[in-house]
Amino acid sequence: MIGKEVTLQDIVLELTEPQTVDLHCEEELPEQDTEVEPERRAYKIILCCGGGCGTRLRLFVAATQFGIRGLQDLLLEEVVILCPDCRNSDLQHGGQ
């Protein structure tokens, strides 16, 4: 711009053809590997009834290494397994 007022000669337009991008190109995406499921192993858990009667209980599970450690933590701290006799005497039906 030369001077205080804008004139049409001061504006330079570069009119070029925009480059188009072929969105339907023939490029193929590689097949994604299917997520490998962690290996589950069978475990036999022998524990005493948590109701106090001392009955030995057997529990069979299939779990990952992480899962069996989590179950171990739950059984040692938060959850107890009951035998059928103790279950009948102390059963809560979800607040009923």
Swiss-Prot record:
Q: Name one GO molecular function term.
A: DNA-binding transcription factor activity
Q: Where is this region: E7 terminal domain?
A: 1-37
Q: Where is this motif: LXCXE motif?
A: 23-27
Which parts form a coiled-coil structure per UniProt?
none
Q: How is it modified after translation?
A: Highly phosphorylated.
Q: Does the keyword Protein transport apply?
A: no
Give the motif span (Nuclear export signal): 68-76
Please give the function described in this protein's UniProt entry: Plays a role in viral genome replication by driving entry of quiescent cells into the cell cycle. Stimulation of progression from G1 to S phase allows the virus to efficiently use the cellular DNA replicating machinery to achieve viral genome replication. E7 protein has both transforming and trans-activating activities. Induces the disassembly of the E2F1 transcription factor from RB1, with subsequent transcriptional activation of E2F1-regulated S-phase genes. Interferes with host histone deacetylation mediated by HDAC1 and HDAC2, leading to transcription activation.
Q: What is this protein called?
A: Protein E7
- The species this protein belongs to is Human papillomavirus 24
